[in-house]
Amino acid sequence: MASIDGLPPLREVIRAHGLSAKKQLGQNFLLDLNLTAKIARLAGDLTNSDVLEVGPGPGGLTRGLLAEGARRVLAIEKDARCLPALAEVAAAWPGRLEVLNADALEVDLAARLTPPIRIVANLPYNVGTELLTRWLSSDWPPFWESLTLMFQKEVAERIVAKPGSKAYGRLALLSQWRTDPKIVLTLPPEAFTPPPSIHSAVVHFTRLEAPRHPADPKVLARVTAMAFNQRRKMLRSSLKGLVPDIETVLREAGIEPTQRAEEIPLEGFCALARRLAG
């Protein structure tokens, strides 16, 4: 990568700027520029897209995105210590990188980007799930074309899980309702500095133009939250606060009241959401 952008290896960048990953910010720096380039390629053709990156750290993935031809990258970094390193990346790619020192949970990201937009990020562990849930719960179709996101491997497995498995839950439902998510890369702890205690995985989400089954997003979100907060309880118990006669509503949706949340496929929860909304 250094031969492409003229910048030093990431270990040198980290040493030069005195950077160390902060656990409280959910940081783990990915230093292998071959891997960051691979993740950028897994996001698809970037040449005509704006790319949103959250948590760029010292800029390893940022460099990969720019080298792979991203039209423009907007990098949101909460940690001000990383800004000088990112400024060096911006100088190497004039006019193509904008760095915003902000919390991604508090910024209107769509307003700063020009479609088509792809989101590619090694998400900070402490906000990754919340950001994903927001991006999946927005108006549809959303402002983004695709998501290519790194998570803890356990979270990635929850995203692609099927009914009846231990990993199956609300995150799988929300992800698979409106996108086609696939695990496209698994990374060992030693790929990062500092090495986390777990493996990581990259998930690529291809958005669907319409949800797989019709349902009101707010109703579906509420139903799945209640059902999976008490996932081992029968649905007639976990959902009893929704309506006076929940057993009748469940049966009308094709669900037995004695079933548990982990047994119900996406289609069943969408049918239940429609009955409750109607």
From Swiss-Prot:
Catalytic activity: adenosine(1518)/adenosine(1519) in 16S rRNA + 4 S-adenosyl-L-methionine = N(6)-dimethyladenosine(1518)/N(6)-dimethyladenosine(1519) in 16S rRNA + 4 S-adenosyl-L-homocysteine + 4 H(+)
Record key words, sorted: Cytoplasm, Methyltransferase, RNA-binding, rRNA processing, S-adenosyl-L-methionine, Transferase
S-adenosyl-L-methionine is among the record's keywords: yes
GO cellular component: cytosol
Sample GO molecular function, one term: 16S rRNA (adenine(1518)-N(6)/adenine(1519)-N(6))-dimethyltransferase activity
E.C. numbers: 2.1.1.182
Binding site for S-adenosyl-L-methionine: N28, L30, G55, E77, D103, N122
Keyword Cell inner membrane applies: no
One family name in Pfam for this protein: RrnaAD
Compartments reported by the entry: Cytoplasm
HAMAP family, A to Z: 16SrRNA_methyltr_A
Stated role: Specifically dimethylates two adjacent adenosines (A1518 and A1519) in the loop of a conserved hairpin near the 3'-end of 16S rRNA in the 30S particle. May play a critical role in biogenesis of 30S subunits.
NCBIfam families: ksgA
Family assignment from sequence similarity: Belongs to the class I-like SAM-binding methyltransferase superfamily. rRNA adenine N(6)-methyltransferase family. RsmA subfamily.
Full protein name: Ribosomal RNA small subunit methyltransferase A
Organism expressing this protein natively: Cereibacter sphaeroides (strain KD131 / KCTC 12085) (Rhodobacter sphaeroides)
Lineage, uppermost ranks: Bacteria, Pseudomonadati, Pseudomonadota, Alphaproteobacteria, Rhodobacterales
